[in-house]
Amino acid sequence: MVHLTGDEKAAVTALWGKVNVDEVGGEALGRLLVVYPWTQRFFESFGDLSTPDAVMHNPKVKAHGKKVLGAFSDGLAHLDNLKGTFAQLSELHCDKLHVDPENFRLLGNVLVCVLAQHFGKEFTPQVQAAYQKVVAGVANALAHKYH
């Protein structure tokens, strides 16, 4: 559960309505894989991840980034029940994929940076603070199965 004020929730929702999930998802996941290269081990089936350019233009990275942000969008619609919303994904990432839950926090922070780049002055300190709360809540929900 994420505790947002009415203004924070409105800001998150308003900005998210402008997000191009295809573009931002691929960019966020790609940046995660470039900046934190050890995360690439979970995506060996994606083909060439040998250079930053290869990662950022990899169609499988873009497609999975879109899928990730689709799940994130679902979380935004259920901010009062993030653990329930992400229960199956938490189980999958814990039991089958064995993803270090710290990676969820890293991806959330990368997503905030990508949003800041895309929205510039519209991504005010208040909007950024609200998104930090949301990505922390999502990361916590995804890590829930690990506890």
Swiss-Prot record:
Chain positions found as N-acetylvaline: V2
Start and end residues of each Globin domain: 3-147
Modified residues (Phosphoserine): S45
Modified residues (N6-acetyllysine): K60, K83, K145
Binding sites annotated in the UniProt record for heme b: H64, H93
Annotated family: Belongs to the globin family.
Protein name, as recorded: Hemoglobin subunit beta
Gene for this chain: HBB
